[in-house]
Amino acid sequence: MAMPPNGLMRLDGTGFGDAFRRREPAQFGHALQDHPLLTLDSIAQLADDLPRESVISDTADQALLVPEGGPPRGKLPRPGDVIRHLDENRSWLTLLNIEQLPAYAELMNQCLDEVEPFIADRRSDMLRRVGFVFVSSPNSTTPAHFDIEHSLIMQMQGEKRLTFGKFTTVQAERHEVVRYWDGSHGRIESLPPELAAYQLTPGIGVYIPPVTPHWVKNGDAISISVTLTFFTPDTNRETLIQAFNARMRRMHLSPHYPGDWPLVDRAKATAMRAYGLRRHLRGRNRAMSA
């Protein structure tokens, strides 16, 4: 499948589609490293333009295992200034939901529109698109964790080593997924055996499958990377079931894990869709009456 000559994603010949279907990591190329929206100065301005709650920051000197909770949001009054001096201040920052700004939404959608033919049967199969920017000081560490979305991480500046692990048992994976929904932010309790490692340099990207443990070590320069995430119908449905189960656990009940009882799963997903729709309509009604 040939991509247009002005495309931003370089997926041909990488085995990306097959790896996606197997939910295995895969390397690919991209042409974003020189994009004007993704320079250090542009990202510093982006950090200042985003709502404070969309900026996460922490020290660059992290342990590989930090199992309890995640870093704080919104604590920096001028995050752009921190980004401009990352070579001095030993920090890393995550800018969440960059699609809140129209220019970044357009760039995100251009990239994911190019990816979609490789992974989806129908255009509607790529759901809940979101973009993130990660900027960090030299030799920073990102603790071991996993995400529930399909993720495409792409390096813009500097380099870093991305290492994947593999849960040794189904029970270990389920334990960590339950912890995620109960507030662990995906940060895992023990380091799993190493599965694969990739060296990310500008122009290189890697597909990160859902619920795949990984950790990151930066090189000797400031690192900038972009991650684009999305759900497919099956992963979106599982999030609904897991969200329902989390609510049940808060009521001191013990729900079955997704997949154990398919008919019950269907009812849980339907209930959460209805709950989400009610919240959406309630929010619209409040906005209209304000």
List PLM regions with ranges.
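Catalytic core of Fe(II)/2-oxoglutarate
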Residues: 187-251
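Double-stranded beta-helix
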Residues: 155-213
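C-terminal accessory regions
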Residues: 263-278
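N-terminal accessory scaffold of Fe(II)-dependent oxygenases
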Residues: 1-156, 160-167, 172-176, 223-225, ...
